[in-house]
Amino acid sequence: GGRLLYDAASRGPTVYTTFICSRDGLARNGAALAALDRALRATQAWIHAHDARDLARLTAPFFTELAPDILHAAIERYRRNGIWSETTHVNKEGFDRLACSLHSGGFVSSRIGYEACVHNFDH
């Protein structure tokens, strides 16, 4: 268990949290998805402009089982490790690293290229 987490953390930037839709869905809902992208960028800017205590206070209602000092320490560790991106842009290196990991781990049968999968909104 612990070794797997260490190995995953040591491989470098990897794209995990993204929003997925079909090309048709993007065509039908492009304006709404662009608005979502703008909202996420504003949230990312706020996260990076405030300290861990501010973020812990804001998110505490979602983590009622955690003591405030534990939540603060976890958020501080995430910040220190650069877990939260400063952009909504899906990085090719991170995408390729995740695709390789999913393929080598047997989660997908073939790798699909970055260009075939990713749409980054112009900022």
Stretches found by the model and what they are:
Residues 27-109:
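Secondary-structure end/capping motifs
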Residues 4, 109-110:
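Residue-level detector of short coil/turn "hinge" positions at structural boundaries
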Residues 110-123:
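Hinge/cleft segment of the Venus flytrap/periplasmic-binding protein
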Residues 7, 89, 112-113:
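Residue-level detector of family-conserved "landmark" positions at structurally sensitive sites
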